[in-house]
Amino acid sequence: MSTGLAYPPRLADGVELLGELKDSGFTKPPALIRRADGQMIQISRLLYLVACRIDGTRALDAIAALVSGDLGRSLSASQVSYVITDKLAPLGLLAGGAAKAALPTASPLLALRARATLLPAAAANVAGALFRPLFHWPVIAAVITAGGIMDYWLFMLHGLSGAYRQVLGDPVDLLLVAALSVVSAVFHECGHAAGCRYGGARPGRIGVGIYLVWPSFFTDVTDSYRLGRAGRLRTDLGGVYFNLIFMLGLAACYAVTANQVLLLTIAITHLEMLEQLLPFVRFDGYFILSDLVGVPDLFARIGPVLGTAFARGRHTRGEMLRRPARRMITAWVLCVIPLLAFTLGSLLLYLPAFNRSLWLSVNNAGHLVAGDIAGRQYAAAALAAIGGALAALSSAGSVYVAVRLTRRAAGLVSRRTAGQPRRRLIAVLGAIVCAASLVLFWAVHGQFRGW
């Protein structure tokens, strides 16, 4: 045993053993462990069995004997020592070790950044418990039926022309639509928390962060991985389900007040629901697809799936998936790679022009705010300020995405060329050529003008 680890070995404080991933799309389902910092870790069955037998009192020989019985094959004390010191300890799962060593954490592609908490885990649990009865099947059936009736009346009988005329002519109404949309988004997150709680898991905090270039709300529902497929899908769909409930509440308010602003908010919420169901970025649709196939992080499977396609008989990580899951993920990869390549490629190619337009919008918003305040048009000033803030945030987000992509590419090249100076030199020269070509493209297309 390493002298830095506690002996007899024991798990670090706050480590939870969650068991095997249920309804997994892997040929050999991984086991799940959650650290005290909330990081969810997938490990093999062998590592999980060793972790289960570590209790702070057993010596290596005793652990080896118990794990051997669990596995049905012999495991020596030295092999257990290797698993503990070389596999479990680096993941931060054992007490002792380097006291202040940075724990490894996931850094998924296109993840939410700059997170801030709106509701702590305790409050999110209370909200989940409060709204939990809304997931009883009779309630779900009633909500969906009422939603269908509402949509038929709104889009087929009543229409939205009156709502557009009222809202576009009054900045106060526009502000009200924006405020109601924010409330709808927060209620959406309560739906995820309630779905998680209904299945028997514990939701974490509800907060807000930056996704790509725009602000986005989130709910920590990592504990739902202890649930089966149905429980995880309930958690995923809880957000759009609560959007539907929110729209029914707005329709009821319209029946009392006849305020057209409420109808336009209902229409906008429909668009938000459709956006959430897109499976190509980390919206609800992405997690729905992920839980349908039983693979937690689809973006992490892009490389293995491509490796399987071009392996020419070699064993790859893509073969760890069951055939139905592999087929579904392959179809998803074939759709998402061109979309992301086009989107992120366009961002890089037109980054200066994009940011110049955004900062012109920020500047114009500043003038509008000053003029509206001088004219005592405070609602219009608030709208202009919100628009300017969103433009500035989009600019900062676009630069952040570009920098992050560059850093990930540099890290990948560094790892692939480690110990190979010739290949690294070629990679560096290639990077210089690409950077110079990009700057030349910007210059030729006049993207530096006006700065």
In which residue ranges do the predicted regions lie?
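Core alpha-helical transmembrane segments of integral membrane proteins
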Residues: 106-208, 249-252
